[in-house]
Amino acid sequence: MTDFKEIILTHKLSALFSKASFGIEKESQRITDEGTIAKTNHPTIFGNRSFHPYIQTDFAESQPELITPPMQSIEEMHEWLMAIHDVVLRSLPEGEYLLPCSIPPAMPASEEIKVAKLDNESDVAYREYLVSVYGNKKQMVSGIHFNFELNPVLIKELHQLSGSVRTLREFQSDVYLKMAHNFIRYQWIMTYLLGGSISADRSYFEKESQHDLPLDQYTRSIRSSKYGYVNKADVHVSFESIDAYVQDIEKMVTTGKLIAEKEFYSTVRFRGANKARDLLTNGIAYLEFRLFDLNPFAEFGMHKEDMYFIHYFLLYLLWIDQDASEAEMQLGKEMNYSTALENPLQPSAFQAEGLSVLEGMLQMLEAIDAEEKISAIVKEKIEAFQNPEKTVAGQMVKALEAGEDKTAWAASLAKKYKEAAWKRPYALRGFEDMELSTQILMFDAIQKGLKINMLDRYDQFISLTYKDHREYVKNGNMTAKDSYIGPLIMENKVVTKKILAENGFAVPDSGEYHSAAAALRDYSIFAGKGIVVKPKTTNYGLGISIFKDGATFENYEKAVRIAFEADEDILVEDFLFG
């Protein structure tokens, strides 16, 4: 078994270990002033759902799904989530809001629930099949899917340094398999801390032949329990290996226990292939974690601090020696179901294990010299294990103990969040540092479904793409219709490189930095490699330092200082001969 921790520490890969790509898919229900599910159609102002990259619908016509593009940091992903919320909330009809809870407090009658009115008839038919098997009430439950990809350079380094005889693709899949195994084993910790679907009305259980859940008692997370969205008891899929996973998925479909591969539900999903069998050739590209409830106290469904916590929790799953077996994963599922149905104000039955994992995370954070804010977040989670009322579910129970009706309480929060979106009606939260003209353009592009590529945020450079057409835009108004756009692109090294890469040209990998502290923190990524440290925009050779054979930390630090003397932003990129 590969000792990833040893390799990371020995070869000073901590900075690279902490880098990843992230994306969020957040489902919600549209509700009325009274807190009931909206009966209106998906707003036409959002354009066609068949291609929209940011705003889709999940199961129901009333259930928008907000999708961030994959981003290189939690901060950037959160900014996109804020921006898409601004667009959706300011585009909804007057008197409509986004429900901040996973389970609607006021569940509509079955005949009032409309499946999403999609162009693709097979997509509609599939949703109607789900209704026949699982009922439409469970389909009305919303949550968050957290997509996670390790830095590909880290995977390559670990592969090379481990001496593995496996191919790079096989090794990458092994890495993600280990993370998936351990997530299933320890997922209960997330349910304890972040679970927030504490109750449901009687009609929610209409497809259950029997249930032992007292409806007058709160739980941590109905959505994550055996009463959540789960497959039938006779559906069994192994996560032991990709081969076993593919074989079992296909068997479930051919025997009729699943109508399609996508019907299989798990709290973690392998991504990188449209069909399970393609994983055998493509390997696992990234993981999708589907466990998370909406946090009603978080304006955008999840606090940014919890996103950071999830990031480093996932890294810890790779850091530890353990690679959970099938038996250990089954234990993890049982612990998760048990945790989900606990009283939110009572300590976890597995408190000792939870505290042990979090203490282990703190040790990892110290070893990799993580930012202090991450350790502070983990310490807050330790406090939540010691004080259950600090968990999301615990906070919900305490809020409702004041006696307010849950439907009215949820509607009040929904109205508060919509008011916040309208507080600065011409700004786009998440991108308020950009020029107002660029913010307005981005708002319209997100609303209509034009794909935005942030070429250079600090220079107000973006591109907009629709099908095969692409426009480069600077300052919100300069496009190909302006003859000066070409020189402006050529003047900006970051934009030039991105456009060249988009068109198939080989360009050196680089990091862009806006502070010396950030550049110095990443020294370990460039140590021992040929690099160039240079200003982002200044030409004439000013402020450039070249290290063909790598730089010592002292020389790297000096080069960073020299580059910042010539420009506000700098690049550190691979040195290429020629």
Description of each model-found segment:
Residues 1-131, 138-142, 178:
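Terminal catalytic/cofactor-binding subdomain
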Residues 424-491, 495-498, 517:
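ATP-binding N-terminal substructure of ATP-dependent carboxylate-amine bond-forming enzymes
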Residues 290-368:
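Substrate-recognition/cap regions that form aromatic- and gly/pro-loop-enriched pockets
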